[in-house]
Swiss-Prot record:
The gene is PCMP-E21. It comes from Arabidopsis thaliana. Keywords: Mitochondrion, Repeat, Transit peptide. This is Pentatricopeptide repeat-containing protein At1g77170, mitochondrial. Gene3D superfamilies: Tetratricopeptide repeat domain (1.25.40.10). GO terms for molecular function: RNA binding.
Length: 467
């Protein structure tokens, strides 16, 4: 209350339109002027007040301005402790600027300020966000030297780091080193396995956690229900549903866990159960609506998905990029070409959302399935980012369906460049030649596969890939 009250005083003194510069200079006045009617602040209180000022920032630009003021005031040099550095880093992370957070950490190290048990988890998170796993491993060495390895926040951070890097043995090693591990470490290992598509292992870890006597929280349940959805195990889904009900509390909003149940049942093919949960929810957010739309689309319920999207807009809920992946996927499954084009254009024109690879993949897939291969090619050529193998694969699938040799020969080199080890493109190209009775070319492709020693991948087709 003291700090929030002082911030209010800093705002009301003087002009109405007080900006952060005015606040900062008044703060220095309160600290440095002994004749002030306000009791001068101690360095510790001043740092806490600056931390409060940072936490109240509503934009990245404001964080940068306050950081600049703090830097120019030389406060960080006068009081070389990690507290204020940590709060600056935390503010950058909160405003999705991990590179700035890392730069602050490097500045702290150059200033010979030792990181504390709160510093490292922030920088680990930043390193994970930009996939700088080399920096992450260096931070692990720092944690070992400073004796922070057993700290629960450092521990969970390193588990997440190694999982993201695909180094699951190292993640498990960090996890196993502490027999008194906390819930955060369990959540990190379960979440890491889930994101890596190792659903069975994630569920096994969840069972082990329950046996250890720890109760799951909403983060645990979101990860394990996602793993269950990946497995499509309805029996397990029912058991996890019970766990979610047990994990809910009156004090805590249950919207995250209920959204995870909608997603889980959708992936298990039970949209009736997903719909029941959705209808019973006291509160819904964009994730709730998007999970329903994506679920309907994945299960081939095109009309239901689009009706859900209509209702979402009617309720005034602003769609996000994931919402449009579901909407466009529904159009693909329903063969609704014109509607798909309209929704694709709507992303930018109505909601100022820049389409990503998944959205471009959907529209290319939609056009290719309809035989509009030239228009699909035009979309690919005009993409603002480099097409990935799935986008090329959708176009190649259309070539196979309609026997377009010229287009298939144009697409094939791009796919081979991206995945030279994959035989899928060769198989589809051979199929296109076979459809046109070009048997010499079919044989040429087969010989090329032998020459390049391309691995045979059974039952794989780019054309069947969905988003």
């Amino acid at each position: 209350m003291f700090f929030s009250g002082l911030i209010s005083k800093l705002h009301v003194h003087g002009t109405k339109r007080t900006n952060h510069f005015t606040i900062f200079h008044r703060l220095n006045h309160f600290v440095t002027t002994s004749s002030s009617s306000v009791t001068p602040l101690s360095p510790q209180d001043r740092n806490k007040l600056l931390a409060t000022l940072l936490s109240n920032c509503t934009s990245l630009a404001r964080v940068r301005r306050i950081h600049g003021d703090i830097f120019r005031s030389r406060i960080l040099d006068q009081y070389p402790i990690a507290f204020l550095w940590n709060n600056i880093m935390r503010s950058y992370i909160r405003h999705e600027s991990p590179l700035d957070a890392i730069q602050v950490y490097l500045g702290m190290v150059r200033s010979t300020v030792l990181p504390d048990r709160y510093s490292l988890p922030i920088v680990i998170k930043a390193a994970v966000q930009i996939h700088d796993f080399t920096l992450g491993k260096e931070l692990h060495s720092v944690a070992v030297r400073l004796g922070f390895v057993g700290d629960e926040f450092c521990e969970s951070g390193f588990i997440t780091l190694y999982c993201k890097a695909g180094e699951f043995e190292n993640a498990r090693k960090v996890f196993d080193e502490n027999p008194e591990r906390k819930l955060g470490s369990w959540n990190a290992i379960i979440g890491g396995l889930n994101h890596a598509g190792r659903a069975n292992e994630a569920v096994e870890m969840f069972v082990d956690m329950k046996r250890s006597g720890l109760e799951p929280d909403d983060f645990t349940m979101v990860s394990v229900t996602a793993s269950c959805g990946g497995l499509g195990d309805l029996s397990l889904a029912f058991q996890l549903h019970k766990c979610v009900l047990q994990a809910k509390t009156e004090e805590k909003s249950d919207i995250m866990m209920l959204n995870s149940l909608i997603d889980m049942y959708g992936k298990c093919g039970r949209m009736d159960l997903a719909s029941h949960i959705f209808e019973e929810m006291r509160q819904r957010n964009v994730v709730s609506w998007s999970s329903m739309i994506v679920g309907y689309a994945a299960n081939g319920n095109t009309l239901e998905a689009l009706e859900c999207f209509r209702q979402m807009r009617e309720f005034g809920v602003r769609p996000n990029k994931i919402t449009f992946v579901g909407v466009l996927s529904a159009c693909v499954h329903g063969g609704l070409v014109e509607e798909g084009k309209t929704y694709f254009a709507m992303m930018k024109s109505e909601f100022e959302l820049e389409p990503g690879l998944s959205h471009y993949g959907c529209i290319v897939d939609l056009l290719s399935r309809d035989g509009q291969l030239k228009e699909a090619k035009k979309v690919v050529e005009e993409m603002p980012m480099k097409p990935n193998v799935m986008v090329w694969g959708c176009l190649m699938g259309g070539c196979e369906k309609f026997g377009d040799v010229e287009m298939a020969e144009w697409v094939a080199p791009y796919m081979v460049e991206l995945e030279p080890w994959n035989d899928g493109v060769y198989v589809v190209l051979a199929n296109v030649y076979a459809l046109r009775g070009m048997w010499k070319d079919v044989e040429r492709v087969r010989k090329l596969m032998k020459t390049k020693k391309v691995a045979k991948i059974p039952a794989y087709s780019y054309a069947s890939t969905t988003f």
